[in-house]
Amino acid sequence: MMDFYQGQEALLQQASRIVETETVPLNQAAGRILAQSIIATTDSPAFDNSAMDGYAICGLDCSEWQLTDTAAAGDTRLLTLQHGQAMRIYTGAGIPVNTDAVIMQENTCVEGLTLSCTSTPVANENIRRQGEELKQGATLLEKGALLNAQAIGLAASQGFSKLQVYQKLRVSVFTTGDELVSGNSQLQQHQIYDSNRPMLLACLQTYTFIEIIDGGILPDNLDIITETLSKAATNSHSIIISGGASVGDRDLVKPALQQLGSIEHWKLAIKPGKPFGWGSIGECRVMLLPGNPVASFVTFKLLGLPALQTAAGRHILQALPECYQAKAAFSIIPNRQKRREFLRGTLRFTNNGPEVIPLNKQGSHMLSGCVNAQVLIDIPAQTDIQQGQWLTVYPI
């Protein structure tokens, strides 16, 4: 079986990227993915300006300066200083001609129209120089960038009122199983409420660049599954199916997908989540998630969501799930697990750095363990874990 990281790379490399674009107003672009790099239209800052409230001075060799005027933000006058002169200046105001430095207000003393300084002024201090952040023509935001609040602000600072973004990725979500019922139904004997589909839909709702299609619950009927997936593929860029992808006689998603298209890979050497797979129906990408709730959650967070982000236009490196290092506050000796395991755990910060410890409830059906967990702890297969060893963890 393919290892997790091999599978993740293959899945993302094979993602069918959306090509359709649209232009949206800047105030509606938050959370979308940029489809065309944008270029700085002007230097930033556009002019030399003061970094703080204080006094602009001319003459670093002076011990006192004579005050002549005041420069405020938005003042359009061309102001000039002569040697031995100073000017009251406010943050963001244009720097007067011949200014050597701006002295912060806290380091000055004013008596009448005479300014003195309690510290030695340094050339160019507290002056923001034109173009020190960006030069006109520099790349402001690259194609594939997620338009978060910072990116929106940066685009606005250069006068952009509209941006070209990728159209929303249409994603259909299904669960399968005769035992599943929706939350508004009365449970019969041996039935359970469908938790996977609401969970997956909730994961997707945080992504503005995805248009969610709730496909509902599919029965364990090959004809119905095949017909439903065939229709969904004509209206979706991607399909997510939880359940029905294992090896049982009632696991009918695989044969349905084989009839309609192809299965490109099935099974990864991970726990939970071994039955994870992917394929396609025409141009529509299909991901097969395990039916056990924790396995479905883990594979969707670590594999499904990165694949969808890549398909939606993000760069692969940006789409990869966030991870960092933390010390093991536990040990596994010996570790006989033949698959890479992602334990649900909690994080604590100590004087020795961040530490992680697994929760007690690790069953792939125990969703409460995910609710109480802060991270997924990456445990390599057949590798002993020592107390204090650095491990990779994924926040959830």
What is each stretch, according to the model?
Residues 1-66, 309, 314-342:
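Short, low-complexity N-terminal leaders and the immediately following helix N-cap/first helix
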Residues 4, 163-289, 293-299, 303:
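Helix-rich terminal scaffold detector
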Residues 22-27, 134, 258-396:
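Flexible glycine/proline-rich
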Residues 25-26, 44-66, 101-113, 314, ...:
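Short beta-strand/loop turn elements enriched in aromatics
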Residues 48-50, 59-60, 78-82, 95-96, ...:
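Solvent-exposed alpha-helices and their adjacent loops that cap or buttress functional pockets
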Residues 56-214, 376:
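Short, glycine/charged-enriched hinge/interface segments at domain edges or termini
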